[in-house]
Curated annotation (Swiss-Prot):
EC numbers on record: 3.4.25.1
Gene: prcB
Gene Ontology molecular function, alphabetical: threonine-type endopeptidase activity
Similarity remark: Belongs to the peptidase T1B family.
InterPro entries: Ntn_hydrolases_N (IPR029055), Proteasome_sua/b (IPR001353), Proteasome_suB-type (IPR023333), PSB_actinobac (IPR022483)
GO biological process: modification-dependent protein catabolic process; proteasomal protein catabolic process
The protein's name: Proteasome subunit beta
Amino acid sequence: MTADRPALRTGDGETRLSFGSNLSSFTEYLRGHAPELLPENRIGHRSHSTRGGDGMESGDLAPHGTTIVALTYKGGVLLAGDRRATQGNLIASRDVEKVYVTDEYSAAGIAGTAGIAIELVRLFAVELEHYEKIEGVQLTFDGKANRLASMVRGNLGAAMQGLAVVPLLVGYDLDADDEAHAGRIVSYDVVGGRYEERAGYHAVGSGSLFAKSALKKIYSPDSDEETALRAAIESLYDAADDDSATGGPDLTRGIYPTAVTITQAGAVHVSEETTSELARRIVAERTEEGGSAR
């Protein structure tokens, strides 16, 4: 149990902040003291229309991140994402980072409005670090999932204007009974509902339908890390093959999917050398097969 602490006071004796349940939440602290810094409040609001002056929907005015996939494997879990961001029918960026380590045993991928999503995930990482510093212990994985759900729910106003954020959270559950199956995947909807994905794999974003269809055929819950990573990259390749908003491996520019693996040893960014080698191998194999999957 956290010990009771006295309130902080300013020089004139005015009580400014009472240590309590909200102090361990950096997001709630911002909401009370600087709400304009929250991701959902850093956009302009339209009172009557969701269209901009050029007739574009508000959701098309900002770059959107697209496809993220997650897989559990024996002893861990991984998260991978493509690099493309789109703005309407245009490619806004070819090398966006969509996969982030949020603490030692968790990572989050983003789909939706890129600017808001990136700020939200970075704030989530600060939230976890802040909690650990204040309370002296890490949040459990369920606690992390609930915190992120609350933050996504806070973006509902922006989502109603077409600026939705849909993260995908993965982590290694230190409280799991079976270390071989301690990897966990949690998905969210735009109103902050959280859903445990127990199939062992999941995908979000515009290419998620194609990525999940690919994973359904090649995923194995008892695969090792390298096999799972290959499956993730291959599913992103299949998603890019059918979804114009998902970027496949770009051999010309040297742009490849990014990935994070999480095991009992912690979260690690997969090196570009590893992802590029796997991507090139997959492209070569598909070329030999005339573009078809094996």
